[in-house]
Amino acid sequence: MHCEVAEALSDKRPKEAPGAPGQGRGPVSLGAHMAFRIAVSGGGCGDGNPLDLLPRLPVPPPRAHDLLRPRSPRDYGVSKTGSGKVNGSYGHSSEKSLLDLDLAEGPSPSCHQGLFLPAGTPPPRGHPPVCEKLLHFPHPNRSPRPQATFVNGSLPAAQHIKQEALPDYQAMVSAHTPLPTHCRAPSSMGLPSDLDFPDRGLTNPAPSCYLLGNEPISDLGPQPEAHLPEGSLKRCCLLGLPPTSSASSSPCASSDINPVIHSSQTALVSCVNGLRSPPLPGDLGGPPKRSRPGPASSDGQEGSLQLEACRKSGFLKQEPMDEFSELFAPHHQGLPPPYPLPQLPTGPGLGGLGLGLAGRMVAGRQACRWVDCCAAYEQQEELVRHIEKSHIDQRKGEDFTCFWAGCVRRYKPFNARYKLLIHMRVHSGEKPNKCMFEGCSKAFSRLENLKIHLRSHTGEKPYLCQHPGCQKAFSNSSDRAKHQRTHLDTKPYACQIPGCSKRYTDPSSLRKHVKAHSAKEQQVRKKLHTGADPEADVLSECLSLQQLQASTLLPASRGKGSQTLSQELLPGVYPGSVTPQNGLASGILSPSHDVPSRHHPLEVPTGSHHHLSPLPTAESTRDGLGPSLLSPMVSPLKGLGPPPLPPASQSQSPGGQSFSTVPSKPTYPSFQSPPPLPSPQGYQGSFHSIQNCFPYADCYRATEPAASRDGLVGDAHGFNPLRPSTYSSLSTPLSAPGYETLAETPCPPALQPQPAEDLVPSGPEDCGFFPNGAFDHCLSHIPSIYTDT
């Protein structure tokens, strides 16, 4: 470790004198314009040349430098050079004096801090890892009265100045670009690669890293951001930066740094607040001041810590402050506090406090948005007390101006203190005037509003209408003024909606009118939205007409079939409707049709119902429909015709898949007649199959001569479901003559299609399952079939 002596010129920064390597330099007496530099070489314990450190800071002009330093009553006299004792060590200071403590080490993480460069200046490169801090010492107070030292070892000024920026301070601050702090660590330390800044420019800022003399150096290694306690996060300059502390990792460097730390008894700061703008009058860029424990902080948590971002730049208005306001004044004179400082209680306005010149409101906290204050509190009462004591009671003379950020008064002063107090309730949200009536929880910031509200409970209406002949009274003058406009036919509140010329005497009526407009628009949108799907409406109407026609079709039918008609017409819609196999057939048959023996074979045990496929089930639909529905329209001979033929039109393919024996047919136009009844089993197939596959096949005509009553009866009792014949028989009721079974799949091309006149119409546009025209067409073929037998 060696010291270098530099001489500071009158109008420039102290220049670095050529350093002589080696240790054991004797004490050097520094003059008024001198500064010394302490450096630790990183290679070994005492050998090596001093490292080339970062370039020195540019010093502002003399006038600006005079404005930078803190003022006291003694500063207005002739400035003298002297020495002040800080924790046992002497330091020389003057207007231009500066103490630079440069700690450099090789492999350890380092901080390039304390730089205030103009906008556009690139960061310094090509320097070894160093950690440098510029410590600013104030002018010592030589008064015989003892001064109370702060925690960090600095001496306070004799008199504090309260600073308030003019309204244009934001524009002045925005003209400068802050240079964030930077920390760099070698890759061997295991830190993220994005912390290597010299190759990337300015990317990731780092917080202040403090070294405390009575703490071991090994505890101050680089720590991940996620593992820092909440208290440490609150003390990292309150600037939202990743709290990464840097310290020495070399034992030799640690042994050299410790004597320096203990000799000065002050906290050596490794990083400076880098989010500050270039130095302007009244702004030194120091870290925030912590409240000093003592009688002045008797209010406890109310004296919360001040943010550095709240110190405004620009031409400042200065007023003397009392002892209480010392807690809220910016403190530029002292060193920043040690990094871990557990002995000081953390103020409630610290955790999660938002940044910004005006002090942004944080969720769950009450923030003060006075122009030079960013204190925050947990409770609203604390904020109200803070505003009154710190910002209103401290004002002198007749100046009662609200400096709340964003206030609509725009710094227009009040002529009385109580008016400013009442006005501040608008910003703080305080409503001390509460309604005393039971069940009413309303509160008001102004007493006048509470009085008007109480009249709603008491019924008092002291404001009478002044129009002759009108006896109306009102509880407040504003309602009376609205009412009187009706007598004068004055309607200043007009509807702004295009096409509407309505006008009203009061704004409440206009608001109701605008709501009516919005309700009408919503109704129109709803109608347009519902009318955008006409197909759904057509389908619902079709289904409702189908049920209505079916319910009016069987007034003359008897039995339980008429009771369950609606369920059997649409078995797919009513899935729970399952009836016996021939219940409807036996129930809706006319008594004059004496065919007990012919319907006996149709009574299949219900236990075999699970063997039925959807196709024979639909086939049985027509077994009972022919004689029952058409009995009024055909002769007794036709009604007592031969029993139905065995089911046909089901052929087995070699793969075992069943196909219909009749190909798809063209369709006839739809009819408006009611559809016939389906079978008691209900339709188990698809709706599309019924509409498109209801053919009439010629295969029955080929088998008509061989059909006989006896053979059919005997065959019905002993038929084999798997017998090899032209028609695959299944254990289902026999089909009626002249009808074809339904098919789910397309018909094979084995049989020739029937002519158009022999086909049953069933178009996709038909609403019913079986249009009446289909039965009229089938009846024309029934006589030719029965007359041959």
Curated annotation (Swiss-Prot):
Motif (Bipartite nuclear localization signal): 511-527
Keyword Cell inner membrane: no
This protein's UniProt keywords: Activator, Differentiation, DNA-binding, Metal-binding, Nucleus, Repeat, Repressor, Transcription, Transcription regulation, Zinc, Zinc-finger
Annotated segments matching region Disordered: 1-29, 53-93, 278-304, 506-529, 573-684
A Pfam cross-reference name: zf-C2H2_15
Uses described in the biotechnology field: The combined transgenic expression of the OSK transcription factors POU5F1/OCT4, SOX2 and KLF4, reprograms differentiated cells into induced pluripotent stem cells/iSPCs. iPSCs exhibit the morphology and properties of embryonic stem/ES cells. The coexpression of GLIS1 can increase the efficiency of OSK-induced pluripotent stem cells/iPSCs production.
PROSITE patterns documented for this protein: ZINC_FINGER_C2H2_1, ZINC_FINGER_C2H2_2
Gene Ontology cellular-component terms listed: nucleus
Deleted gene: phenotype: No visible phenotype.
Positions with biased composition (Polar residues): 80-92
SUPFAM superfamilies: beta-beta-alpha zinc fingers
Biological process, per Gene Ontology: fat cell differentiation; negative regulation of cell fate commitment; negative regulation of transcription by RNA polymerase II; osteoblast differentiation; positive regulation of DNA-templated transcription; positive regulation of transcription by RNA polymerase II; regulation of transcription by RNA polymerase II
Keyword Oxidoreductase listed: no
Description of how the protein assembles with itself and partners: Interacts with KLF4. Interacts with POU5F1 and/or POU5F1B. Interacts with SOX2.
Job description of the protein: Acts both as a repressor and an ctivator of transcription. Binds to the consensus sequence 5'-GACCACCCAC-3'. By controlling the expression of genes involved in cell differentiation inhibits the lineage commitment of multipotent cells. Prevents, for instance, the differentiation of multipotent mesenchymal cells into adipocyte and osteoblast.
Protein name: Zinc finger protein GLIS1
Originating organism: Mus musculus
